[in-house]
Amino acid sequence: MPVRPINNLKLSAAVLLMWWGTVLSLSAAPPKVVDIKPYNDGFVEACIDGMIYWTDIDGVHLDSVNIRTVIAGIEVAEGSVLAVSPDCSVMKVERNGKTGRLCRSQIRGGSDKVTGIACSGDRTYILTENGIIYNTVDFKTFTPFDFNLTYSGYYDPARFSAICASAASIFIAGTYDNGMPAVFTSTAGNIWSERSLTYTDRAETLSLEQQPLSMAYDSRMDRFVLACTDGYLFYMPGCSHCNSLEHKALSDIAAVGFNDGRCLWTVE
């Protein structure tokens, strides 16, 4: 696969843009990119320091807004960006710079922290590291679901790092206490099933060992994709026996996004 360096592009972290047959790479200084989502004919990426960038399909920054708060994750809903902080405060951000706070902190005392936000249907789901899933339809009333408590004795406890949703499914991902990856899926956020992480390589059945750091939904291929440690992407289509693993980078992949056959990811 040919590799071409791209110069003089304004991005905020090490970024790779891929489409079938071509990989583009570039690098710049931190701050860390924590999330990437498709937006119209490009992407929107969020940095931990509060910067949000709208890009074209090639990942070139076009517009930006600084919300001046730490960002744990973003989601795009009805053309607006929903940015969630580690303490579960949510802001609505428009590309023209207009911002508004949808809710204030839902987490007190610093005992837990948010790792991501996702929308499915009319509901918004917010995931914490300890496995609390908050869901809301209006950002006024939140219903918490304690995954680790609910499934105690059935699933091993996990620490969660990513949430992603399509119109039909919600996925959460994290790591068990033994360091192995954990992925669960649900249709409504109240009943969860463990997702198989086995895949076939050279006729050998293996199981994912890398830890998930972020997750994206590839609507074109109808599959969820884990961004993992050691530079791997793990593809999870509707067929749970059709998973695949692909090595993309020399270091951990911090965030990944898909739009119309393009894949944009950042490395730590």
Indicate where each model-derived feature is located:
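Bacterial N-terminal signal peptides that target proteins for export
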Residues: M1-W19
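Beta-strand-rich domains and repeat architectures in extracellular enzymes and scaffolds
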Residues: A29-G50
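Repeated scaffold domains used in trafficking and secretory/extracellular systems
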Residues: P31-P38, T69-A77, S111-C119, D156-C164, ...
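Entry beta-strands of beta-propeller and related beta-repeat scaffolds
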Residues: G42-V44, S80-L82, R123-Y125, S169-I172, ...
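Recurrent small/Gly-Pro-centered beta-turn motifs in extracellular repeat architectures
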Residues: C47-I48, S85, T128, A173-Y176, ...
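Loop/turn residues immediately N-terminal
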Residues: D49-I52, D87-V90, N130-I133, N178-G179, ...
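Conserved Ser/Thr-centered positions that define the repeating blades of beta-propeller domains
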Residues: T55-D56, V93, N135-T136, T185-S186, ...
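A short beta-strand motif characteristic of beta-propeller blades
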Residues: V60-V65, G100-I107, T143-G153, S193-S196, ...
